[in-house]
């Protein structure tokens, strides 16, 4: 058919004088990709290679052909190839990478963005630091100057604005997340609620003037109202200028084997046998599995069908299998998003066709609007406390030294407490015996694979009663809160700065090299740390630290740095953990009701929390059409079971029931209930 069409096109060209061009219909890159592409089509369309009524590209010629192949194919009309080349020469497109394309924030008339940011910051500074020291003002000024020089003023104003909108509209916002809590500007803008001075958090861990990269402020919102904040951003910056971000699910090793086996119409038992030979490890590949499992290697070498299955799977492994919308990512542009990136529709939602990594490389503003269930629990509990007790709590102003809260944590009674409710963490809290927020921060940072190895040393230091031995006295002010252990990335930066004289910006580069185990960089930095570089870094020896001590400190620091945690992030999560623990300790009924409401679609979790209520002496009342609500509710110090948590009863039916009861009074009998609800859901 194509041959007939081509002959007709040549004839039309000669009759009309319109020049010919030739093209190459390409669906895969290499000729040998024909079969894997055919298998991929089967996977995509739910067919097998044996199905006759399926989509296929027959002939194996739909690959990107070389210039020589194109000239050979169209040797009867060489001018067509020449014309195609002329068009290609006239086409020119270039992408500008790493150049910021931030949207502009509209400031009040007569003000500049820089001036407006300073105005808001200094107003916040005056409230948060009423008796401010000069050095604190200097830090704020340094941060503002750095932000201005790096071109991020609009970024901070944009984040400040939508967080202000959320708080003004009663949407609970988390205390912060990640390294942003190390910024005094973020704190003064109320983007974060963690005082960076109080917890020795470092600005350069968040924004490094010696390593230009986009700031990354991730924000947690009540998960039920997160979309309201996104909708506000869409209204403010324009629907065309805001889009959510695509994400791709790729074909992992086992999934690739199963999908390919299904497409090849292989017996299920054979495919299942091969897939189970692949170790269930994070990041496992088929190639690694062949080296690790001799049975798999033997099957590959001896069984023809298995060889075909694995060879084809190797070609498809890692390719995108499906696309979806990123759970939190939103891109905001100064012009319509389509001016910068291609778009696609997914269930009515406009998405970028580029992933967030590429968007960042293109200099576009990516924000993460995260929904955190725990914040919804806190907000629901606070509202219930106000309804029942008439007390309006401000969760940002809780006393941090509440012995009742720490007693509960030390006993491991942390079911439902953010970050502290796993069995292992409960046991750790019983061993750690935290008595302040610093202990909780360290606990969250330590309880991870890798750092867990240092837990015994940390607990030993904590119990030593101030008798911790330091390799050099200059380490004491840096490590005293963690009893001589390097727990945080910020401590690595402080050691490099205070002992060897690095700038904080450069110390962050060293920290990054350590965490990524860059041997060549580390060998170079080791010499600079100990002896200096004769220019910017004086080194430990010049600062009065013996060579042996400097070598030992660097080696220990390198070992710890592989696992060191971001203290800013741990501090934010410790605050949320403390808030939930405080609510559980002081208002257990309201807290447990809110907690169960947040998981009422998960029967197993509800059951677990019911058991916790029994241990706490909280009585659970059965569901009642005259007393109950959609959510778990508090009544006379007891918890009423949620109507919407009853299996096979929809939320719409519950809402209709409650609305009818509130409008016309309680139901007096089953007959009354049936008559009044007849025709409803």
Give names to the regions the model predicted.
Residues 1-93, 142, 157-210:
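Charged catalytic cores and adjacent phosphate/nucleic-acid-binding surfaces used
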Residues 19-23, 96, 244, 419:
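A structural signal for short, well-ordered beta-strand segments and their strand-loop junctions
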Residues 28, 60-61, 102, 108-681:
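Noncatalytic, beta-rich nucleic-acid-contacting surfaces in large DNA/RNA-processing enzymes
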Residues 90, 107-108:
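Extended catalytic cores of very large enzyme megasubunits
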